[in-house]
UniProtKB/Swiss-Prot annotation:
The keyword Thylakoid does not apply. It catalyses: tRNA(Tyr) + L-tyrosine + ATP = L-tyrosyl-tRNA(Tyr) + AMP + diphosphate + H(+). Its main location: cytoplasm. It comes from Salmonella arizonae (strain ATCC BAA-731 / CDC346-86 / RSK2980). This is Tyrosine--tRNA ligase. Pfam families: SYY_C-terminal, tRNA-synt_1b. SUPFAM superfamilies: Alpha-L RNA-binding motif, Nucleotidylyl transferase. GO terms for molecular function: ATP binding; RNA binding; tyrosine-tRNA ligase activity. One of its GO terms (cellular component) is cytosol.
């Protein structure tokens, strides 16, 4: 695995991985990194109760910088989360209550923590919350000390805002328009508090980052830098990080480790080697060798399994990975003996389609209710043709009624038609 130690080459190494979309004054930043460790930050606004896959690249970028000896600051936006970032958003965000946002702040801080080392000496990570400096600031201070440094002419010409201003059906409120000032002040504040010299974020944050650079120069006469990572796209043009069920979350209660693992297993061949560069710490040579091996093997590529394993371990730890692989193996082989009650809970959460049934239901009706067959008549034929299994065991009796032995842990039965059509029955 690649540990990015040579700070002067760090930007080039990130570029080789495709992880740099834009950077301000690249030569000066490279020179500053060559002089020794810096502090850098990335902000995470609590717009939900969990981070999602879109946050993973900048979060891992913080980790890459820390591995190279720099000091990462993870800023959770307890204040900015109350306002909402308008950047490239088609419509105004819904405002959440202060209580809700503070709950989300606590959850996101907890989620960020395992990715960074908060106890490693001089480059130990710092967790910050911008509510600490905005919560007690009054409007006059905001307008006099921050607002006077921002030109409205420049603000309305920023691409992220311009798109909203040009839409007839959606303008932009003063609340969202002021977001740029808040994020800009975050940079200036962190520069003063912790000597932060670099902000990283998604490429949609470029306008906010450059505002922070300008404000820091005006308030503190310090040169600071910005670097954006690309917004991840898929080769087929569809949005990355979404499934039919919505976003892929980092919280295991919202997206189970099993479903998370499956998301990566289903990565297209056209994307997988690029994603290995974005989402893992494998070195480039190792990834290129794997690509070459897959091309020449004549078999199904191994890259998806490597990617799924690496990223699931990063996000859910060894235990989450082992559970995800165990469930995958059991479903593939139809042998459920290895599954724990917690594994079934993962499947019930979002692993496979699920229905609740009353005890006494027969097999034909279960197949219809589970939408594995359109009618009892069709279900009868399918059962008789030996195409149905209950908990991995074939059942060919159309009149079969489920019994207590079928209810694993007193609650779960896995019904399968053919090789790939599953439904988990949860008994009432």
């Amino acid at each position: 695995m690649e540990i990015l130690m040579a700070s002067s080459n760090l930007i080039k190494q990130l570029q080789e991985r495709g992880l740099v979309a834009q950077v301000t004054d690249e030569d000066a930043l490279a020179e500053r990194l060559a002089q020794g460790p810096i502090a850098l930050y990335c902000g995470f606004d609590p717009t939900a109760d969990s981070l999602h896959l879109g946050h993973l690249v900048p979060l891992l970028c913080l980790k890459r910088f820390q591995q190279a000896g720099h000091k990462p600051v993870a800023l959770v936006g307890g204040a900015t989360g109350l306002i909402g970032d308008p950047s490239f958003k088609a419509a105004e965000r819904k405002l959440n209550t202060e209580e809700t946002v503070q709950e989300w702040v606590a959850k996101i801080r907890k989620q960020v923590a395992p990715f960074l080392d908060f106890d490693c000496g001089e480059n130990s990570a710092i967790a910050a919350n911008n509510y600490d400096w905005f919560g007690s600031m009054n409007v006059l201070t905001f307008l006099r000390d921050i607002g006077k440094h921002f030109s409205v002419n420049q603000m309305i010409n920023k691409e992220a805002v311009k798109q909203r201003l040009n839409r007839d059906d959606q303008g932009i409120s003063f609340t969202e328009f002021s977001y740029n000032l808040l994020q800009g002040y975050d940079f200036a504040c962190l520069n003063k508090l912790h000597g932060v010299a670099l902000q990283i974020g998604g490429s949609d944050q470029w306008g906010n980052i450059t505002s922070g650079i300008d404000l820091t120069r005006r308030l503190h006469q310090n040169q600071v830098f910005g670097l954006t990572v690309p917004l991840i796209t898929k080769a087929d043009g569809t949005k990355f990080g979404k499934t039919e069920g919505g976003a892929v979350w980092l919280d295991p209660k919202k997206t189970s480790p099993y479903k998370f693992y499956q998301f990566w297993i289903n990565t297209a061949d056209a994307d997988v080697y690029r994603f290995l560069k974005f989402f893992t710490f494998m070195d480039i040579e190792e990834i290129n060798a794997l690509e070459e091996e897959d091309k020449n093997s004549g078999k199904a590529p191994r890259a998806q399994y490597v990617l799924a394993e690496q990223v699931t371990r990063l996000v859910h730890g060894e235990e989450g990975l082992i559970a995800a692989k165990r469930i995958t193996e059991s479903l593939f082989n139809g042998s459920l003996g290895e599954l724990s009650e917690a594994d079934f809970e993962q499947l019930a959460q979002d692993g496979v389609p699920m229905i609740e049934l009353e005890k006494g239901t027969d097999l034909m009706q279960a197949l219809v209710d589970a939408e594995l067959q359109p009618s009892r008549g069709q279900a009868r034929k399918t059962i008789a043709s030996n195409a149905v299994t209950i908990n991995g065991e074939k059942q060919s009796d159309p009149e079969y009624i489920f019994n207590d032995e079928d209810r694993l842990f007193g609650r779960y039965t896995l019904l399968r038609r053919g090789k790939k059509n599953y439904c988990l029955i949860c008994w009432k």
